[in-house]
């Protein structure tokens, strides 16, 4: 409801990466996407699929669900994320990610390594929601628009919660 949402580029192959409850923002995204056949989702989770709104996504886009049930599953999921991101980076696709901070840090690292076009939806605590308290700041990189440097910090509630991975530090 606050700030900026994910980019929607209908003619660009788009990979959605969701970790746990990070699947929620993608429900609206896939239902509004004009070319859902150009979108794929990779979803990692610990709880059974019945805990997540997968039916409303699965009717629009292909969903690869990887459930963590034993310790080795997490390594497999991370490897799968990296391989999928590599595929989409090579074809200049768009990669969108939402999930817990450790998940986003992993995606952020791969985005830099692959020089991929990636947007991350951050789950910062937003106390006031209007930019007055500065409680939700995110550190920026040198890629942040020059006219809007803000001393290396931006408010997630106003300038996010979705950011290009190359413009922020995690």
Spans of features found by a protein language model:
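Glycine-rich, flexible loop/turn motifs
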Residues: 2-4, 118, 153, 158-159, ...
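FNR/FR-type flavoprotein reductase catalytic core
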Residues: 1-127
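Iron-sulfur (Fe-S) cluster-binding modules
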Residues: 92, 166-170
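Short acidic, glycine/serine/threonine-rich loops at helix termini
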Residues: 54, 131, 168
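Local cysteine-cluster metal-coordination motifs and their immediate loop/turn environment
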Residues: 25, 101, 123-161
């Amino acid at each position: 409801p606050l700030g900026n949402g994910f980019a929607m580029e209908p003619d660009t192959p788009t990979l959605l990466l969701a970790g746990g409850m990070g699947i929620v923002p993608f429900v609206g995204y896939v239902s509004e996407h004009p070319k859902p056949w150009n979108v794929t989702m990779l979803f990692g989770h610990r709880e059974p699929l019945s805990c997540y709104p997968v039916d409303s996504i699965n009717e629009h886009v292909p969903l690869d669900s990887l459930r963590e049930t034993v310790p080795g599953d997490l390594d497999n999921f991370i490897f799968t994320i990296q391989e999928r991101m590599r595929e989409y980076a090579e074809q200049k696709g768009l990669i969108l990610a939402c999930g817990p901070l450790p998940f986003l840090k992993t995606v952020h690292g791969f985005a830099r390594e692959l020089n991929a076009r990636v947007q991350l939806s951050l789950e910062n605590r937003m106390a006031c929601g209007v930019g007055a308290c500065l409680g939700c700041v995110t550190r920026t990189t040198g890629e942040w628009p020059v006219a809007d440097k803000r001393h290396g910090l931006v408010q997630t509630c106003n300038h996010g919660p979705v950011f290009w991975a190359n413009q922020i530090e995690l």
